[in-house]
Amino acid sequence: MDENRRLGAYLLFYWFTSYTQTWAMLQMAQTASLALQHSEGTTGIRHGAGITPAFQAGDEGSTEALFRILDLGAGPAPCGIAAADWFRAAFHVREIEITACDQSTLALHIAEELAQSAGATLRRVAPWRAGPDPIPEGRYNCIVMGHLLNELWKDAPDRIARRETFIIELGNYLAEGGILLILEPALLDTGRDLLALRDRLVKSGWYIMAPCFTQGPCPAIAQHNQTCHSDFAWKPPRVVRELEQRTGLDKDLVKTTALVLTRSRSCQTSLLSDNLYRVVSEPMLNKAGRRRLILCGKQGRIPLSARLGDGYPAESSFKQLCRSDAIYVDKPEQRETGLALGPETRITRL
């Protein structure tokens, strides 16, 4: 990234998308951490359930303590700065230090200036390469890896196993209740690699905070040529909109295949409701004229369909659903091909 034009182009366009991906995934994980099971037959978030330790600020939850973020393969640190901004906004964390590691000294100099303007301290570690170089010593409340993992051992037949070893070692640098965020491109090959790694990490004792509502095997992996990614609507900065017009790029949605993980057992994922789902597809129209979405929950993937115009109370909510929405589906009808809206069905968006 030391080539000035390439870095300049990144700052004008992709910096903002990586920032948005980070913020959105952290927000998704926080929402999921509150989605604990109600008493039987109820829906919605259990008020007073509280935030899991993975989202408590600093040592012993104190907002006065130093909150430490490790950004690996940071570049100009969009992910680290987004995490700092998010934790400050969500939990009023005051003192934030970002340790940013990258091969490019120039990128980290820019990152330091950007972090300073965001009210965070940034410690530069350069030149640094993931794999050969050691992880900077310390205990971190949040570790972020933005579009780095797919570059590691990318042509090696045992790349998934080697990445698992890398992540397990990285977990030793997490503070109690700390979280790890991995962002990858929303592409088939990189996505399936991350999902395969996800399954191995779950078996190794990691917990998926987002986007998954299951700690079982990823159902997308079992289907050939399938992956899973998250979409986020955003309002691009003016410079991004202008570059879109000039280049023909379409960034109405920010997309990523990503995981938010923790080793904390207090996530209570076993308490998640059976009727809690993530929307993992775009709306589709089947041959019978029914509108269909694919949901993913504790039991895996399942279709939810409706014949629009039936006038059921949940139809309006159903028509507004988008990929990545977290929803409760109460009293759906059971069809041979999955779930369907009925007269008593209720949909609640988190």
Tell what function each PLM region has:
Residues D2-S33:
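Class I SAM-dependent methyltransferase Rossmann-like catalytic core
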Residues P76-H92:
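Conserved SAM-binding loop of SAM-dependent methyltransferases across substrates and taxa
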Residues H109-P136:
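S-adenosyl-L-methionine
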Residues N141-I160:
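A short SAM/SAH-binding and catalytic strip from SAM-dependent methyltransferases
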Residues A161-G177:
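A short glycine-rich, Lys/Arg-flanked "PGG" loop and its adjoining helix->strand segment in the class I
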Residues E176-E184:
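Conserved beta-strand signature within the Rossmann-like core of class I S-adenosyl-L-methionine
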Residues R192-L195, W206-L259, R265-S266:
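Class I S-adenosyl-L-methionine
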Residues V240-L350:
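C-terminal lobe and adjacent flexible extensions of AdoMet/dcAdoMet transferase-like proteins
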